[in-house]
Amino acid sequence: VSGNMFASSSEPGIVWVMQDTNGNGLPDDEWYQLKGSEYGKPQTVEDYAVTYYRPSGAGMPVRWSDNRGGEGEVPYNNFHRQEFNYPQWIEAQSYTLYGVRLAPNTYTDTSTGNIINGAYEWGYADNYGSDRATGDNADGAAAKTLFDIDNAVNADGTPANLQYIDFVKVQTAINHATALLGEVSTEVLAMADETLR
């Protein structure tokens, strides 16, 4: 999975995979999480849900609330090219997403004053971890992270033992924003099977 991460900017995404078990060519079978370095840690929320609310007008932040009692806003920053952060294809006044949430790893470098979105050790898309396939990527160009389907787990954490995968999805793993940079959101630039035969 290619993202645009570099040493001071990781926006991790959790990778989910599916086998087309029923053979109908649709992603309607079981999704399996590819576990990463934060899997099973107490600060990782495995049953996270966040609801986003339509803003009252263009250029406004998007309010959110979650199933942990948290609430906040996705800021509308001047560098956004679109009028709304809220998806325009969703007609409802709110929508809810379900997934896994990692603890934010954002901090200010005291020596430079720069905001750093720190990396997690391994196992996430758009993350500057030990499993990246390319060098330092100082300019934030496309850079690969390698994944192994042997890391696919059932909901109870046991190995899924998948033989192959037919579908892949990536879920932003952080619910965090900074005033300067905006929301931490995973960028996926490409996907490829590196073991295709």
Which ranges hold each PLM region?
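Predominantly extracellular/luminal cell-surface or secreted proteins
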Residues: 16-20
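Acidic, glycine-anchored loop motifs typical of Ca2+
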Residues: 21-30, 48, 52
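A short beta-strand element within beta-rich, extracytoplasmic domains
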Residues: 1-7
